[in-house]
Amino acid sequence: MTSVPFAGERRGDAPLTWGQRAIWEAIQRTVPDDHYFNFGRVIRLGARPASVDGARWALARLVERHESLRTLVEDGHQRLLASGELPIVLGDDPDDLLAELAAPAYDYAREWPLRAGLVTSGPDVTHIVMVFCHLAADGLGAEEAVRDLRLLLLRGEPRGSRPPQPLDIARWQRSRDGRRVAAEAAAHWEREHRRIPPTMFYVPSEAGADPPIWRASLRSPAIDLAAQRIAVKHGTSTSNVLLTAVTALVAQMTGHDTVAMLPIVSNRFRADTRGAVSTMAQEGLFVLDVEKVRFDELLALARPAALRAYRSAYHDPADRARVLAEVSEDRGTPVHPYCCFNDMRFADHAVYRDDVLIRRALGETSLTWPMSQDQLNCRFCVHVSGTMDVSVTADTRWLSRPEMERFLRGLEDLLVEAALR
């Protein structure tokens, strides 16, 4: 174990940003399994290894540049500290070190939201491991941090001017312009919540497992190839293809004619959020009336619904909570979809794939069960990774393990059939 001191330019306090508030509420609902939200990056230094002192220096400059990495959260507020010392763990294997650093839940009020580790070979650092508290960064925020760290190691300085910081984002969100954006989003949440079913998975499965939360992961090159072919054919993104397909299957499994999904949206479309090492991603509200039409026709109907969902994602969670409480009271029942979609890929490039290639890829599909735990803040979450692993994390009290597998196999069947039609 070693450490490195850092000294930033300012300190301060502010309410949580909308993105921080959203993930803070999810964390609170997931305790004691909130380590679920920790995530990491392994930076392989390759042909240009660093010295231990050089890696320590770069990590210190990174924490000084990005204030989220020295921000603590306590009692619903963020507290930015100017200086401190970052612990750095030494290890022999990057994957083992990543697992070690990611395993414990964070102490959000006392622990720096970045855990760092170095893998060495003799005097050289071959890998740098970073594990982020989700209050400090989301996936795209972590990529910004990785790019800056590489530039610090290579050139001694990061790129560009000072990036957006959480304190400044929080202050804008409380401004008149920020409240106008929040009000527009709240109107969408209220309008749609007055017409959607109270929740998506509403019939107990009668087959709850112990522990109740499980993840099924389908590695399917066929889904990847089929989604690309459909996206090119219809002039859309593979993410929209997958969101529409998941929605269609939820309708099929639940019997709902109107389906509400909560896609995770990056919220990095604005100049004052782009480039921030912070948690900007939030849930949008995607609502689709699933008609008795073919999948390609449903895809056309989904496009404007997706745009509305993306706009609604940049919202104040306090407004959303108020809207849900008011609508639930008016309707006489709790209203919440508990049905999420998270495309975690950083790029969405589609090529028109040959049908022979798609059919051949069907033989490469495999299913695993990589995770189980006691608590989750949702009933049904679909994740799409960069390796085209499509997973379902679900509460088996509402969707049994056989139903989870049936969903994933059905998703592959639907997309392949639509691609080859």
Stretches with model-predicted labels:
Residues 57-61, 147, 184-187, 191, ...:
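Generic recognition of well-ordered alpha-helical segments
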Residues 3-13, 33-54, 109-129, 206-270, ...:
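Gly/Ser/Thr-rich phosphate-binding loops and adjoining beta-strand/alpha-helix segments
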Residues 91, 114-167, 403-417:
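Active-site-proximal acidic secondary-structure segment that organizes catalysis
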Residues 66, 70, 143-147, 257-264, ...:
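Extended, hydrophobic beta-loop-alpha segments that form or line the acyl/peptidyl-thioester binding
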Residues 12, 29-39, 56, 67-68, ...:
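His-Asp-centered acyl/peptidyl-transfer active-site segments
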Residues 3-15, 47-64, 76-113, 295-306, ...:
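A short, small/polar-residue-rich loop/turn motif at beta-strand boundaries
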Residues 1-30, 56-93, 112, 164-213, ...:
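Short amphipathic alpha-helices and their capping loops
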